[in-house]
Amino acid sequence: MDDNKRKSLDAALKSLDKTFGKGTILRLGDKEVEKIDSIPTGSVGLDLALGIGGVPKGRIIEIYGPESSGKTTLTLHIIAECQKKGGVCAFIDAEHALDVKYAKDLGVDTENLYISQPDFGEQALEIVETIARSGAIDLIVVDSVAALTPKAEIEGDMGDQHVGLQARLMSQALRELTGIVHKMNTTVIFINQIRMKIGMMGYGTPETTTGGNALKFYSSVRLDVRKTATLKQNDEPIGNRVKVKVAKNKVAPPFKQAEFDVMFGEGVSREGELIDYGVKLDIIDKSGAWFSYKASKLGQGRENAKAFLKENPAIADEITQAIQNSIGIDSMILGAKEDDEGDE
């Protein structure tokens, strides 16, 4: 660059710094690439699939899927993990359906969880924006986009047409919210539901999410949550097998998948993931229906092996450490306790 151009650029940069603050625009080579902070999801496999050890901080996240697929359970685990690291969380319960006892069973500190049950969509999104601007909240969960009903629709008569009203509401809110959450390093998770496209024929998926296309565009990460099987013991349902696909990822390579068990009343099964990864990495030996680790017989059948690990946390921690060493990821991803002990 010649001297005249450089002088003109320097003058423009100084003017921008004076008007908008220092660091408004920087040359990429002069700025170190920042490591993206993350919040663990409570699932080893999903943290790995996301590529950075969890959901990114300071970004908008969409978690969507059919009903009863495990979306809210996953977000409650993320809240619990955020609180373990000293984070402050808020839950915008637009569906008015939060089960406080279940949240507590999953490890959520409900005493210190901020909750709001808004009456209409505009109020919910205004609450999200206000608490995000405060800079004091680390994680905000909105459950769900489908329940963010515009005020005009609530106050209108049954049968009135309100075409595109919710989509416009989401688009306007997200335009403002994206910059705020990035600046304040606040993560906002929107839970969304699946709908079938009307009159869909030919190629392409017949499914879509509610609230228009704005959330798809502004989300840094989109997680597609699906139930693949019902887990049974003695013919009694005890949980679901869940598959999560990273449908969009702006912070790491997308399209990776993770599968894990979600047990009724307990949430994501850590022991189930230890068995899955242990067998995959030859840390746990599987011979027929029997699982064993070193000299210890874990049990016959997967559920018995999971029960053994739950009753023997020392062996579970040892397997966790072995998996960690084998994969070469830090303790944050596997939810080990070293980070917490180091902070004290």
UniProtKB/Swiss-Prot annotation:
Keyword Methyltransferase (UniProt): no
Localization in the cell: Cytoplasm
Disulfide bonding pattern of the chain: none
Keywords assigned: ATP-binding, Cytoplasm, DNA damage, DNA recombination, DNA repair, DNA-binding, Nucleotide-binding, SOS response
Positions bound to ATP: G65, P66, E67, S68, S69, G70, K71, T72
Pfam families reported in the protein's UniProt record: RecA, RecA_C
NCBIfam families reported for this sequence: tigrfam_recA (TIGR02012)
Family designation: Belongs to the RecA family.
Entry function: Can catalyze the hydrolysis of ATP in the presence of single-stranded DNA, the ATP-dependent uptake of single-stranded DNA by duplex DNA, and the ATP-dependent hybridization of homologous single-stranded DNAs. It interacts with LexA causing its activation and leading to its autocatalytic cleavage.
Protein name listed in UniProt: Protein RecA
Source organism (scientific name): Campylobacter lari
Chain's gene name: recA
